Structure formats: C-alpha cells, structure tokens
Amino acid sequence: MAADVHKKKGWEVPNGSLAPGDGQHAERSESPTPGLAQGTEPGAGQEGAMFVHTRSYEDLTSPEDGGAVVRSPEERRGEPAEPTSMEQISKDFSELSTQLTGMALDLEEEMRQSQEGKLEPSPQATRHDSVLSGKEEEDVTMDTWRMHRKHVFVLSEAGKPVYSRYGSEEALSSTMGVMMALVSFLEAEKNAIRSIHADGYKVVFVRRSPLVLVAVARTRQSEQEIAHELLYIYYQILSLLTWTQLNHIFQQKQNYDLRRLLAGSERITDNLLDLMAHDPSFLMGAVRCLPLAASVRDAVSTSLQQAKAKSLVFSILLSGNQLVSLVRKKDQFLHPIDLHLLFNLISSSSSFREGEAWTPICLPKFNSSGFFHAHISYLEQEMDLCLLLVSTDREDFFTVSDCKRRFQERLRRRGVHHALQEALRTPFYSVAQVGIPDLRHFIYKSKSSGLFTSPEIEAPYVREEEKERLLGLYQYLHSRAHNSSCPLKNIYFTGPRENLLAWVTSAFELYICYSPLGTKAGAISAVNKLMKWIRKEEDRLFILTPQTY
C-alpha cells in the first residue's frame, strides 16, 4: 500500500525529499540572504511542518501509487484499515456515486454484469446526458473546438475513452484509439513516448496503468508542467475510485467503460483544470493561507484541536482555496496535492452549503488504497468558511458532527467571530502594502512549510486574459528554474509590458513581476525589501505554529 505517511524522525520519503526536520527549531535568520537554511526562511514553521515535503514535479513523478511501502505499525497508526476485500470499498463508492449522480452504483454488481455481457448502455456514461455536467457538448469537427489552447484526454489502456476536456468522448473515441495505438507501438519497440513537439503544439503523454493521460497544448508551459497537470487529473480520478478499485476493475475486464463509474464527476475534473489555469497553488505545489492575525489564527487552531474525536485524522478550515487552519493527528502528514483535491471537491459543488455532508474520499498521496470519510459543512451561510473533518470511521458521522458543534462553541467563547468576518471581507492583500512602487505582483514559497503567499492580482492585469498571461509568464520562469537537464537559480526576464525575476534557493522560491521601466539593479533592491516585508508579516501570511491532536 502506497502512502506518504511518515514518522517525524529518521525517515525519507520514497522520492528522496526530506522529512520535516527537527532543524526547524533552529534560530531564524533576520537577514533575507541566499544563505538562509531550509527551515529558517520567512514563512517556515517554527514548531514542525504540516505537510509532507514536496519537490513539485519531481514529487508527482515518484514511484507509482499502489507499490508496497514497508512501515511499522506505529507509522500506520491513523490510516484507514487495509481493506480485506472489495466489499467495503464498493460500499463506500456507492455512497460517493449517490452524492455525485443521485444514483447508487454497486461496483461488484457492475463487474458481474460486465463479465456476463449484460450491461446496457448507461445514460450516465456520456457527458451530454449528465445533468451535473452543466455545459453543452462541442462539435469536434468545428474550428472552435480546435482553437482551445489546451485539450486533455484520459483513456484506458484498451483505448476506451474515459474523459475529454472539450467535446464528447464518443466523438473522440477514434482519436483516443490512435493515441493508444501510438503508445502501444512504441512500447512494442521497448520504448516509451513522453511528448511530441510540432507546429507550436506540445502533445504530452503520461501513463499510469491502467490509464493513459494525454494533453495537447499550445501554451508557455513546459512538458514537465503539462505532465504535472495530467498527474493531478490522475490523482483526481483516484480520489473518487481508489487505486485498489481502479486496478480491480481492469483486472476483471480490460475494456471496461470507466465512464459508468465516473458519471457525474466530470464537473469536478473540469473544475480542477479551471483551477490549474488560474491558481498558482498547483504550479507551486504549495498551499496559500488566508491572511489573518496570528492571535486569531492561534485561537481558531486551538479550538479545532480541542474539538477532536478518536477517529479524526485531519481538521481543516478553509475559505475559498485558502487555508485558515489545519490540525493533524500526531505523526500524520497531509500532502499538498491531497489538500488541493479537497479544495477542488468543495469548490466544484454548491450543495455543501446546504447542510452537513458525509462523503467517502480517497486521499491518494496519503493512502491510495481506501476511503476516508469527510464531514463537510459551512460554519454559517453568510460566512465563506468551510470545515472539513476527515475521519477513519465510516460510522462516526454523529460524533464528528458534534466536533463541529464544539468547535463553533469554542470560537464564540473566544470571541474571534468578528475578526474572522473582517478577514473574509479582504481575503487578499494589495501589493501596495509592500511599499515598492514598481512592484506589480509576486509569488513567494517557503519550501520547508509547503506554504506560499501572493497578493491580489491588480491593474494592469484586470481582464481574465491578462491574468492568464501573467500566470503563463510565471509558468515559463518556473519551467526554466526547474528544468530537469539545466535548472536555473536566477532568471531575469525583460518584456515589452513587464519585467520579471525568479530566484530559487534550497529554502524558498520567489517570482516577482514589476514595471517594464524598472532596472535589474532596481529589481534586486526590490527583492531585498520584499523579503524583509515578508519576514515582518510572516505570522499573518503563514501558519507558523501548526497544531496536532
């Protein structure tokens, strides 16, 4: 069973990244210089880390999920029990499919009918019949379909369509068949296809048996970054099915139509692709915090910590796609990818605002073999605060629901409701607060904490296409800085509409955008001022004292 669950001492994750080290208790440097050690940079947690350390693309391409990882019983504490059969997973999936489609799908019954050849064409297996899709199909023969800057396709190794970003899977089935034939042909020659570059397009292939994911893009993104996004789609599918169930399905029938089980989930995958096109969290492989006074955040975290139950593994409070607080079980570390998938699930549906939801969810980077159960609810209708309580016990709804009640009581007792409401009125800060005239925007990531901060995108990047263009420039700098063959630590980019600078060290990553009239010397001076400002504001912009049960 693959999992990124680790002890705090004496371990190394399979991809070779470093564990949350005890060195994070070291003295924190007051000088923002390149000599900052990891764990002492602005934004680094002073009392341990919340997340498994990641190395962005390299982490995503670590050994495939499902491989055995030998760990002691102590290391396994807090995880869902290893399923002894498919029955429990099937039962959990039936609950999840009911929430997604309004229809309960029995996996074992599906597989029995499939083997007996009794499956009727499912009206839920096509996107245009899914009432949850919320958008019309595009004609794949029209120029408007071809003009999209990025297409994403998911297919099985048998060439069966699973998902397409635009257009119906039926209309694209022959195209996907050609893609699979190309992959298979090269594999027969004992080779593997990773990408094709032609006429300004990149065609990127990612194979995660039993699935093949393909993107056709004409963006500034590198091959690695496009593969990064495809792997997010793969993990999104695992979060709905589990790795165990996905492999069980195709072991039983190689040409199974997976759309039957994923019907109704297209909007979740669509939403994930939309988020990746606009939110730098995915590019940075990190989580952004809601700017909040340290005293208020500490009161929230303490309230979460005290409203605990035996089965709880993670208690998460979020606003939009920003983290307010996270409390974890001791020695259990959440992965940023799993948190991104939770954010995406919540932002994909407004139904979570209507009451308390109790839904199975797989956290594929934590444990890809089984389901947790997540209690999802908003604290109040008028407040954009969503509470996720992740439990290992599928029968523990009422106990976990009581945790929410106790959490709200403690918030009221501590008198932090008003402060939270004020923070939610301005969920982003202005770059003008930094006090650097030519500075337009920046992204700063603390590597040891797995957190990043950036201001609101303001003029001249007002229109949506301008915001996407700015993110595209950051993607270009990021791809150059993390190029697998020739990574760069410092990049200075000059353009007709803005200048940019990237600075990547072992402790942090910084990307800044400023006026095209600025000079290189001015940019370097701005970096020094900006780092001092981040250090001064770090207790408001980051979670420096993460709590555990």
UniProtKB/Swiss-Prot annotation:
InterPro entries: FUZ/MON1/HPS1_longin_1, FUZ/MON1/HPS1_longin_2, FUZ/MON1/HPS1_longin_3, Mon1. This is Vacuolar fusion protein MON1 homolog A. Plays an important role in membrane trafficking through the secretory apparatus. Not involved in endocytic trafficking to lysosomes. One of its GO terms (cellular component) is Mon1-Ccz1 complex. Residues 1-90, 109-137 are annotated as: Disordered. Belongs to the MON1/SAND family. It comes from Gallus gallus (Chicken). Residues 110-119 have a biased composition (Basic and acidic residues). PANTHER family: SAND PROTEIN-RELATED (PTHR13027), VACUOLAR FUSION PROTEIN MON1 HOMOLOG A (PTHR13027:SF14). It comes from the Eukaryota.
